[in-house]
Regions:
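Catalytic glycan-binding domains that act on GlcNAc-containing polysaccharides
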Residues: 24-193
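Bacterial N-terminal signal peptides
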Residues: 8-18
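Bacterial N-terminal signal peptides that target proteins for export
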Residues: 1-9
Length: 193
């Protein structure tokens, strides 16, 4: 991945690197409450964690603990029982890459780090795992921008990483945790003439 576009986006992500209060829109939500705790415990900027969560399961400004994502589609189950049943149905249909919970943790790659599928839908466990994973990615990659890029798209997928980072930055800005920098705007927003 080009370090140039990463450095451009870093300016936008840097804005939210100071400790900040929980997002008022999600203060009563299960996922949001756990984000404030995980950000504090793991030293992750809440704005980044929240913007990643919004990108993953955000709908009308709230995150969803019982979301499932597979093959580009997201299903919002009403409760954990319905979510687990939906997961089992997806698996019976042959789907392997299924993302679960508040932060859409991929079961295929990360499921062995949880005691069960049901545990992956637990907001405290899901968000805590995502926070630790982002922190690990930042240590390995050297910046929050690259950590965010790798969170969803993994390595060797520059176009998907760029799209994902731009979506996270847009959510960072729309949630009030950051502001567009000129460099981030020029990278993420197509010019209209």
């Amino acid at each position: 991945m080009s370090r140039t576009w990463c450095q451009t986006i870093a300016a936008a992500l840097f804005i939210c690197s100071a400790p900040i209060a929980a997002a008022s829109a999600g203060e009563n939500g299960l996922c949001e409450r756990e984000m404030a705790r995980a950000a504090r415990i793991h030293g992750i900027p809440l704005g980044i964690l929240y913007a990643v969560g919004l990108t993953e399961t955000g709908q009308r400004g709230a995150l969803h603990p019982y979301a499932l994502g597979a093959e580009g589609q997201t299903l919002f189950a009403r409760n954990v029982s319905e979510a687990v049943t939906s997961f089992e149905t997806m698996r019976q249909k042959g789907l392997r890459l299924i993302d679960l919970g508040c932060m859409q943790i991929n079961h295929y790659y990360h499921g062995s780090n949880f005691e069960s599928v049901q545990a992956m839908f637990d907001p405290a466990k899901n968000v805590d795992y995502a926070a630790r994973f982002l922190k690990e990615l930042r240590a390995r990659e050297g910046s929050w921008t690259m950590a965010v890029a790798r969170y969803n798209a993994g390595p060797n997928n520059d176009p998907a990483q760029k799209r994902y980072v731009c979506r996270v930055v847009a959510n960072l800005v729309s949630s009030g945790f950051g502001a567009w920098t000129e460099q981030a705007r020029s990278l993420c927003q197509p010019r209209t003439t």
